[in-house]
From Swiss-Prot:
Catalyzed reaction equations: L-glutamyl-tRNA(Gln) + L-glutamine + ATP + H2O = L-glutaminyl-tRNA(Gln) + L-glutamate + ADP + phosphate + H(+)
Gene Ontology terms: biological process: translation
EC number: 6.3.5.7
Annotated source species: Methylococcus capsulatus (strain ATCC 33009 / NCIMB 11132 / Bath)
UniProt similarity note: Belongs to the amidase family. GatA subfamily.
Biological role stated in the UniProt entry: Allows the formation of correctly charged Gln-tRNA(Gln) through the transamidation of misacylated Glu-tRNA(Gln) in organisms which lack glutaminyl-tRNA synthetase. The reaction takes place in the presence of glutamine and ATP through an activated gamma-phospho-Glu-tRNA(Gln).
Residues at the active site: K76, S151, S175
Protein name: Glutamyl-tRNA(Gln) amidotransferase subunit A
């Protein structure tokens, strides 16, 4: 059953070829057998999953099934789950059990999905390799000596290893798209405000966005249909009708205008990846698309601007973790200052501390104008670059990452090298645009992803563009060795 896509599993359940309980038991057994070598899960929830599966079977028997009824999924451990630990990959929240469900979790529960557990991630979603997790690194199923990407590395690895047909992720600067590329799956970051952030532990509030991760664009469309929509509890969530994403998958691509930014194909990009991206674009030409070169002149400023804005917001958001109300608390503090200092010092890892330090510095008196204000001005310039580009083209394509998955430790000693792993994805977050990554081939036995970027609220178009490519190719069907059995 693990060979089937989410859409195929839903069809099988509807035809009563198997029950949700059988499907859930099969995936739980697979997690128990394979995940010790991958470490993609922080917490598994077999009792909850089987109870949800039994309830789903009852709904299926009554003919009350929805598109996700009885389908196993897993949640990134950044989403609050009532009665289940929500750690955010940090020692700070190692013992935190949320009293409520995040909006995304509520919506999957209401749709009848089955939650298998909570997935590993970089601490507080800060990282590009899943090496910053308090619970240890996640291994890439294609080569366990390499990283799965981050911060949604557990989600990407679990889907790639067929431990779960679909998983949630979050994307602040590439944290859905980059791990999707490294693990050879499909991942979508929606437009900022398309999916509620209520109950999603905040990293950078003006950048964070939740999205689906699965094997195919069709599966992502099914998941996004559940996730998207207005939520009055999130002031940044947009009150806008949600289209039928799956219905849009049948549209042809004749006359689709594709833009290739020249800035995406310069120094630093692995030539093998560039070749695979151009080969994928050639496939789109055969499908009727028109391709032209475009320019995003301020792209080179996206990484430095991001690493002012995101740490500044992180510094503010993580101030709430003080050892008083919840989270890690040091033993025997001598006074309040000691409680704060030791609790935060013990609870946060090195990368989180680095970003808090950067952000606090950027917001401090005398430096605010020089750093934070300037970064926000650059952010506007980047948004304007995209606006002008989308007057000429319908979608933008390019590499998701400059390299394939790298080995553990290869970049951990050099933060700048690590940050540059997201050089092609960060600008999309700064502008609040939707973007996705789809697999387009392999280099040195490791998957390569292509990024597709669209205008605001064009997720239906992106999903269709990705789906048509996946109808014409089979890269998304490839499975890591030792995982297919």
């Amino acid at each position: 059953m693990h060979r089937k896509t989410l859409a195929e599993l839903a069809a099988g359940l509807e035809r009563r070829e198997f029950s949700s309980v059988e499907l859930t038991q099969a995936h739980l057994a697979r997690i128990e057998r394979l995940d010790p070598a991958l470490n993609s899960f922080i917490t598994t929830t077999p009792e909850i999953a089987l109870a949800q599966a039994r309830a789903a079977d009852e709904r299926l028997a009554k003919g009350e099934a929805g598109p996700l009824t009885g389908i196993p999924i897993a949640q990134k451990d950044i989403f609050c789950t009532k009665g289940v630990r929500t750690s955010c990959g940090s020692r700070m929240l190692d013992s935190f059990v949320s009293p409520y469900d995040a909006c995304v979790v509520e919506r999957f529960n209401a749709a009848g999905a089955v939650m298998l557990g909570k997935l590993n991630m970089d601490e507080f979603a800060m990282g590009s390799s899943n090496e910053t997790s308090y619970y240890g690194p996640v291994k890439n199923p294609w080569n366990t000596a390499t990283v799965p990407g981050g911060s949604s590395g557990g989600s990407a690895a679990a889907v790639a290893a067929r431990l779960v047909p679909g998983a949630t992720g979050t994307d602040t600067g590439g944290s859905i798209r980059q791990p999707a590329a490294f693990c050879g799956i499909t991942g979508l970051k929606p437009t900022y405000g398309r999916v509620s952030r209520w109950g999603m532990i905040a990293f950078a509030s003006s950048l964070d966005q939740a999205g689906p991760m699965a094997r195919t664009a069709e599966d992502c469309a099914i998941m996004l249909q559940i996730m998207a929509g207005f939520d009055e509890r999130d002031s940044t969530c947009v009150d806008r009708p949600v289209p039928d994403y799956r219905a849009a998958l049948g549209n042809d691509l004749d006359g689709l205008r594709i833009g290739l930014p020249k800035e995406f194909f310069g120094e630093g990009l692995d030539p093998a990846i560039a070749g695979l991206i151009h080969a994928a674009v050639d496939e789109y030409r055969r499908l009727g698309a028109i391709v032209r070169e475009i320019s995003l002149p301020n792209m080179h400023l996206s990484v430095p601007a991001y690493y002012v804005v995101a740490p500044a917001e992180c510094s503010s958001n993580l101030a709430r973790f003080d050892g008083v109300r919840f989270g890690h608390r040091c033993e025997n503090p001598t006074d309040l200052a000691d409680l704060y200092t030791r609790s935060r010092g013990e609870g946060f890892g090195a990368e989180v501390k680095r970003r808090i330090l950067i952000g606090t510095y950027a917001l401090s008196a005398g430096y605010y104008d020089a750093y934070y204000l300037k970064a926000q001005k650059i952010r506007r310039l980047i948004s304007e670059d995209f606006r002008r580009a989308f007057e000429e083209v319908d979608v933008i394509m390019g590499p998701t990452a400059p390299s394939v998955a790298f080995e553990f430790g290869a970049k951990s000693a050099d933060p700048i090298a690590m940050y540059l792993s997201d050089i092609y994805t960060i600008a999309v977050n700064l502008a609040g645009l939707p973007g996705m990554s789809i697999p387009v081939g392999f280099s040195n036995g490791l998957p390569v992803g292509m990024q597709i970027i669209g205008g605001y609220f064009s997720e239906d178009r992106l999903l269709n563009v990705a789906h048509r490519y996946q109808q014409a190719t089979d890269w998304h069907t490839r499975t890591p060795a030792g995982i297919a059995d």
